[in-house]
């Protein structure tokens, strides 16, 4: 059951990434059609922008992310239990030892960052280290190590970059349309049924693609959380430890300092406890659902 769930989560992520590229292609084609009457130009521009965004964000320094989240790097002497658990989980996962950080905050949380296992880092709040016992902490760190091993940070970063590119292209297209960039071409365009269909499709793409892209990005984030939970159990062989850790995380207070949206998706638990109108707009699946999945492994 464990390996079936891991495989299912991976398949869902592949499907969502493909959906992203479809959206990027659609928004590029729509912008190209409306502004310069060239689908090809719009698609090429969209793919170039998406690639630039992705590469620039993937190679963002780990130190920058840790600095944004007020994390400080530690040595084995400063927190030996925490350090050795990270070391043990990395060894079991067969990845290089990541850097270890602590965030001085009473809330219960942790995250991992880094574009590859070779430049990864794991951070945990001081509150988490004080409240969790060893088995629970192994579950949390196993979750973060799984994010590193599964290249989740890279996948999530690509998702954020593609969503940003889609939003940027839609915004540019809408502004240029509004200020007259495509107005004359629209007036002169073929009024055939097919032309009207293309026009409606293009306009709807500019309007709806950013919203759908955001929903797909958040869905990827949620799927990777489920996958990391299951992968943590694969590493620790202790589902109860992970379940108890999630139960404690559900009772945690929000973090004491603001956390930006990009960093928020990295954490094992929603750091600001924002109430969402729908699970479709949440970076994390409900903890109750995560526990339920673990119980049925």
From Swiss-Prot:
Keywords: Cell membrane, Hydrolase, Membrane, Metal-binding, Metalloprotease, Protease, Transmembrane, Transmembrane helix, Zinc. Its cofactor is Zn(2+). GO terms for molecular function: metalloendopeptidase activity; zinc ion binding. The active site is at 144. Binds 1 zinc ion per subunit. Zn(2+) binds at residues 143, 147, 225. Its EC number is 3.4.24.-. Pfam families: Peptidase_M48 (PF01435). It is a multi-pass membrane protein. GO terms for cellular component: plasma membrane. It is found in: Cell membrane. It is an enzyme of class 3 (hydrolase). GO terms for biological process: proteolysis. The chain crosses the membrane at residues 14-34, 39-59, 153-173, 196-216. Belongs to the peptidase M48B family. This is Protease HtpX homolog. It comes from Streptococcus uberis (strain ATCC BAA-854 / 0140J).
């Amino acid at each position: 059951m464990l390996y079936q769930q891991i495989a299912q989560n991976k398949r869902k992520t592949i499907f969502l990434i493909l959906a992203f590229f479809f959206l990027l292609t659609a928004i590029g084609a729509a912008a190209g059609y409306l502004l310069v009457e060239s689908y090809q130009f719009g698609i090429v521009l969209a793919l170039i922008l998406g690639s630039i965004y992705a590469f620039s964000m993937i190679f963002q320094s780990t130190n920058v992310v840790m600095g944004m989240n007020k994390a400080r790097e530690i040595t084995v002497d400063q927190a030996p239990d925490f350090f050795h658990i990270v070391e043990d989980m990395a060894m079991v996962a067969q990845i290089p030892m990541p850097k270890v950080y602590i965030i001085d905050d009473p809330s219960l949380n942790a995250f991992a960052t880094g574009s590859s296992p070779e430049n990864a880092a794991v951070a945990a709040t001081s509150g988490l280290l004080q409240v969790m016992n060893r088995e629970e902490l192994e579950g949390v760190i196993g979750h973060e190590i799984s994010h590193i091993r599964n290249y989740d940070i890279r996948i999530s970063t690509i998702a954020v970059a593609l969503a940003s590119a889609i939003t940027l292209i839609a915004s540019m297209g809408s502004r240029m349309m509004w200020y007259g960039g495509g107005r004359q071409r629209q007036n002169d365009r073929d009024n055939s049924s097919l032309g009207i269909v293309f026009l409606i499709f293009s306009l709807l793409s500019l309007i709806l693609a950013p919203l759908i892209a955001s929903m797909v990005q958040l869905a990827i984030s949620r799927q990777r959380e489920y996958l990391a939970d299951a992968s943590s159990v694969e590493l620790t062989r202790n589902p109860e430890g992970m379940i108890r850790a999630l139960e404690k995380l559900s009772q945690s207070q929000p973090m004491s300092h603001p956390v930006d949206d990009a960093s928020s998706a990295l954490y094992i638990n929603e750091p600001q406890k924002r109430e969402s109108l729908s699970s479709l707009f949440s970076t994390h699946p409900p903890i109750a659902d995560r526990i339920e999945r673990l119980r049925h492994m």
